[in-house]
Amino acid sequence: WRRAAACPCRDPHSGQARPTCPVCEGRGVMWGQPRDAWTGLSSMKVAREWAEFGEFTSGDVILTIPSDSPLYGCGEHDRIVMADSSEPFSAILTRGENDRLTVPALRLERVFWLNDAGDAVVEGAIPSVAPDGTLGWASGGAPPEGRQYTVQGRRHQEYFVFKDLPQDRAHYGGRDLPRRVAARRFDLFGR
């Protein structure tokens, strides 16, 4: 779990984040260091219940957060990585322009691009991944400069807190009741 904070790069007149901000990358929100926490994922039946409160988008989940979890204090836009599960991903990048993954990869499995004629696939070497997601090829096997290429691998599922769902009461008998929050796939952040 990573707590969100508004990035101070925002324009005071429009509220728009500076697109070239190196801290928030133009998103208007920055995140703190990761912290271990735990939560429960509610079923899709409960997620359909969330549709009554607003738009339901594929990738929305309802989290039930116990009061003894550090995540209990989460707020809007906080990021949550599901450390016990992973999913396949595929990203198209351009060599020399955006050699950087926007999602944290668990592992890379394949890199490929089309040949000059565009009629055959060329397999590349698996690059190293820097902490900021930048890809690097130390011993060759990189795509040609300016060429689009595909990176495939596995990543942890990542969500951001979309809305805190209303509940009648937060306490019972002096104890905090679990919270319910709607979380949305981080891929959809800002859309």
Question: PLM features: residue spans?
Answer:
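N-terminal disorder-to-order initiation segments that are Gly/Lys/Arg-biased
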Residues: 1-56, 70, 163-191
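Loop/turn positions that initiate beta-strands
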Residues: 75-79, 146
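Conserved SET/PR-domain catalytic core that frames the SAM/AdoMet-binding pocket
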Residues: 68, 77-78, 84
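Extended beta-strand solenoid/passenger and fiber regions
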Residues: 85-147, 152-190
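Signals and flexible motifs at protein termini associated with secretion
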Residues: 36-47, 80, 96-104
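Short alpha-helix capping/helix-loop boundary micro-motifs
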Residues: 59-73, 136
